């Protein structure tokens, strides 16, 4: 019997998946939007929302484990934590952007909410 694992495997090993999601989360924090596949966008949304919540609560050590970029770390705590101070959750939004020409994969744009 197959049980739900709670996350998408995305065709990658655990360490590769974690590294990819951490890198995508860093890119979203720096650029405030990223274009990727729908499945990856849904997974990285969990990571980014958790990072913003941790930054709002001032838990910087847990954020440092995920964000290796100092500029993204600084922006998260100085800009984004204050921007979303009164917002209880849902810091990202996913827009579907059609199909990718090469492999016909569904593409989405994930953005930080203003």
Curated annotation (Swiss-Prot):
Keywords: Ribonucleoprotein, Ribosomal protein. It holds the Pfam family Ribosomal_L17. The keyword Metal-binding does not apply. Belongs to the bacterial ribosomal protein bL17 family. GO terms for cellular component: large ribosomal subunit. This is Large ribosomal subunit protein bL17. The gene is rplQ. PANTHER family: LARGE RIBOSOMAL SUBUNIT PROTEIN BL17M, RIBOSOMAL PROTEIN L17. One of its GO terms (biological process) is translation. Coiled coil: none annotated. InterPro entries: Ribosomal_bL17, Ribosomal_bL17_sf. Part of the 50S ribosomal subunit. Contacts protein L32. GO terms for molecular function: structural constituent of ribosome.
